[in-house]
Amino acid sequence: MHIEKLDFENSPYLGVFGIATDKVVLIREGLQEKKLEVIREVLKVPVVEASLMKSRIIGVLGAGNSNAIIVPWYVWDSELEKIKNAFREYGIDTEVVPFQTKYTALGNLILTNDKGALVSSKFSREEAKKIGDILGVEVERGVIAGIVAVGSAGVVTNKGGLVHPEATDEELEWLSDLFKVDVYVGTANMGVPYVGSCMLANSYGVVVGHLTTGPEIVKIEEALGFI
């Protein structure tokens, strides 16, 4: 099965609590084992439990692709070491890189796959270049449908992308060129336009908030390359 509906302690906003790539899922601590097992089965990569600055909202605070995961620069040393040790145990060669900036919610401000990255226009050009260098991809600054929180306004994998329903045709073409995949508009969790906050997805599957409707699931499957 490549798509499943889940809740995290009754919250349908799965993307807030994790970071998914084609090599690993970094997930908040404290979830039931049966839910971790669903994530492993659907996304088909190791699942590593973690916290960032003792917070569970690691999908808000961090972002990444197969090359690197970017976290706030003041992440605790013990947390960073725990993540790196887990990656070593699983043989995961993804770097974990603290990034110095005045912004904390990096996951809300960075949208990336293994082919490109869109960073919020809030970042300076110099910061954007550094982010692109860390992630090892082409990077552009911008917004989606006028929204600076591009990481919450979209989800993108190496197979496809889904973004805020008010994105224009021109934006979809631009995003498709940047990420080298087809990008569509859609919603999740019964009409929520901030799809990046609603799901965890990679090239192998997607877990989405339990409030997501049947028509929304069909659109998500199409956009992320499973149909």
From Swiss-Prot:
Segments traversing the membrane: none
Keyword Glycosyltransferase: no
Pfam families in alphabetical order: eIF-6
InterPro entries associated with the record: eIF6
Alphabetical UniProt keywords: Initiation factor, Protein biosynthesis
CDD domains, per database record: IF6
Signal peptide limits: none
NCBIfam families linked: eIF-6 (TIGR00323), PRK04046.1-5 (NF003129)
Role: Binds to the 50S ribosomal subunit and prevents its association with the 30S ribosomal subunit to form the 70S initiation complex.
Name recorded for this polypeptide: Translation initiation factor 6
Record organism: Pyrococcus furiosus (strain ATCC 43587 / DSM 3638 / JCM 8422 / Vc1)
